[in-house]
Amino acid sequence: MRRAVAIMLLTILILSGCGSPDQKLRSAAAQSARSAASEVSTTRLAVEQLRAQRLWTRSAGQIVKDAEKGVETAASSFSAQQPSTPTSTRLYEQVTKTLDDAQTAVTAVRIALGNDDLAAAEQQLPALRQSAKDLGRIGELAQ
């Protein structure tokens, strides 16, 4: 996990040295979104496997806790960006909202699993799917 964070930060630092301000922000958005999308998908998979009785509650809870930390790291990394044009400001607001939505869904799952409430965790599956889809679109920005 720390290695992935270090790689992500190094990538952002390297990308910050080249390109226009809008391109730099798109690259940072894409990197953060890809990282968060992975964690959201991990959370979704944990809930689905728990529902199918292929995973223990305790293991699922730990997986989701780790995923929540990953989403928080991605969101924090992106929120440190400084948009400098109207275009980059709009992108910043959109990406920040999408990351916040993902973080909210993953946190809701963690809380539900901590309360041994699989039904409440399952209610987050549509939000997790939508977040993964939205983050995937953002993740394609720098490609």
Show where each model-derived region lies:
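Alpha-helical segments in soluble extracytoplasmic regions
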Residues: A28-T107, Q123-A127, S131-I138
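C-terminal motif of bacterial Sec signal peptides marking the signal peptidase cleavage site
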Residues: L13-G17
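Bacterial N-terminal signal peptides that target proteins for export
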Residues: M1-M8
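Bacterial signal peptide processing site
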Residues: C18-Q23
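Enrichment for repetitive, rod-forming helical segments
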Residues: L9-L10, A33
